[in-house]
Amino acid sequence: LSQLGTVSAVNFDNEFSVQFAQLDNQLDEDSKLQAATIFDGLRVISNHYQHSSTPVFLGGLFAYDLVANFIPMQGVELKDDGINCPDYSFYLAENLITIDHQSQQATLKSFCFSQEEQVEVAKTALSISQKLKNIDGVLSIKAASDKVSTNFEDPEFIGIVKALKHHINIGDVFQIVPSRRFSLACPNTLASYAQLKHNNPSPYMFYMNDEDFILFGASPESALKYAPDNRQLEIYPIAGSRPRGFD
């Protein structure tokens, strides 16, 4: 990592930071592709364990705003959205629980990345194993408030949509996806995710419980839905699909 950016220690808890230089927008496309970016830090970790006899889990999230680090957007200012979630967050699991939904079985896997951590990782794995044996299968559910807030009121959002329609009409763009955020209290995120999974069993679902945020959701697409009462199959195509042109 020291070959890609400036490495500095953060504290005494085996943490460090890597500062990458900002991408020079004056570079040609080939040079941009070869320049070091924050993704290279992820590649270093991924490549280090790609030949491991037991595959390790490395996963996380990229935020849409991360594109500003690679594509110059003149005149566009990214404002604080008030959501305490980073643009780039990944996890290398020491203890991993894999679930086979068909057999209803869970498997605990532990990974030790240094000899000094063997005892601690083993203790943590044993603690998790004991908790799994005594887990309560019923999630407690609390009634949520029905008070909903939004980041755009109706008149303001209508004005935004009209402005975007104008850009489509004059040929600036052919597709725009405006967003509007609705917020309400969520006293039990895991129970809410379970209900979402029941109502919308999408193959594109996620639940991330970080120290600073909890993020869960599902894409509206469903791989396949089957209704036993009328023996009907139903699919939802990927959003944004459009017919192939004839020119």
Tell where the protein language model's regions lie, with residue ranges.
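Extended alpha-helical targeting/anchoring segments
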Residues: 1-247
